[in-house]
């Protein structure tokens, strides 16, 4: 029936009992990778989207400010920004002013883009959409962190458990509130996988650990005098602090999985190559990329900055 749940009936009960006996009784976290669920979080702040998408082992889809116009009212009225009475009237006034500036600028920037990039032979519909997207992309930097968005998530039970622990231990009230809502919904579809979250002896201890770790970090930040804001510098605001890996690391990483020799032997052979040969090898490892989705191999993970 339409109202039945995945774990209803005898088969569902047996499956739930199996998961719970292994997951709770033996503590084998990996079994929680065997089931997943979709969650849609609507009207969440830009700050919360960062909390939601911090976990590595999940799939996320966020409504992009690059394609959505924020000059329209949301259901119930008002611009699309997070509201809380504890933030006071000055907050709402400031948000309305920012979104008002955005709305006025959107019309002007769209007109500028239409003049800057004339239509030519392109059909009118696609051209108008591209002009709109250009204007939205140029103005998205005006949108504040309180801007609301939607985020879709697909994740395993294990990934959701970690997400809920982070949200429940967060100092952000919105994160704790939405975390409770996510837990309630997951309890309807994958209850065994999130059964530890609200148990004091399991999830409770984990959440307390995360809270204590954050408090300890904040204490050390204060002790080291790092809790004060820096003055805005006149020069560049981005510095290259360090680079991990070099050309040899990258090339060795690319070749390793296709060879039957040690990495030491690979590096020895690379050292004997000329600059021209290395450049040719690098080009071959990159390949003929037709678009941004054609990604080089994992050997490129050997270098980061």
Predicted regions and their residues:
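A conserved ligand/cofactor-binding region detector
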Residues: 1-305
